[in-house]
Amino acid sequence: MNSKKEVQHVYLVGAKSLGAYGGYETFVYKLTEYHQNKENIKYHVACKANGDGCMDESKFDGVTKINDHEFEFHNAHCFKIDVPQIGPAQAIYYDVAALKACCEHIKKNHIPHPIVYIMACRIGPFASHFYREIHKLGGTVYLNPDGECEIIWATRQKPDFMR
């Protein structure tokens, strides 16, 4: 009997950083802090590399720098996404680039049955592409029901309050 537990890899997309910006960021910080000693869970956290709300890992104790765009914190692999300064479209760009990076990491490292958790769905029409890609890689996608797209992209119409 194999006593080695299989590691569950969980990719977190949608927070700009860990604990320094808002609700999603605090959630990710606390989640990784709580599970940092669990050997059977490995978190991979997308972080914004530049601009408003970007990740500044130098403000945290216990960070192990891997390179300019990757570090370990709370036993989580954190990777930074460069985002062009393109106004409100930054959020969409960031989520799409983060999901692309997750898929590349899963492929490159042959990660079995990964979980990708999207905290804020700002990817709209790109969602089905990434769902298919992640499912093809043997993964599961979870979308936060409090994300920002449920009505807009489900109906393809803007509610009255958004017109």
Predicted regions and their residues:
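N-proximal low-complexity "stem/linker" segments adjacent to membrane-targeting elements
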Residues: 2-5
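Local beta-strand N-terminus motif with an aromatic residue
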Residues: 7, 111-114
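N-terminal strand-loop element at the rim of the active site
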Residues: 7, 12-21, 34-89, 122
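Conserved alpha-helical elements of sugar-nucleotide-dependent glycosyltransferases
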Residues: 23-31, 94
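Short, well-ordered alpha-helices that flank and scaffold nucleotide-derived cofactor binding pockets
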Residues: 29, 33, 37, 100, ...
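A generic structural motif
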Residues: 38-44, 111-112, 138-139
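An aromatic- and histidine-rich active-site surface loop
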Residues: 90-101, 113-139, 143-150
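Nucleotide-sugar donor phosphate/pyrophosphate-binding loop at the beta->alpha transition
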Residues: 139-140, 150-163
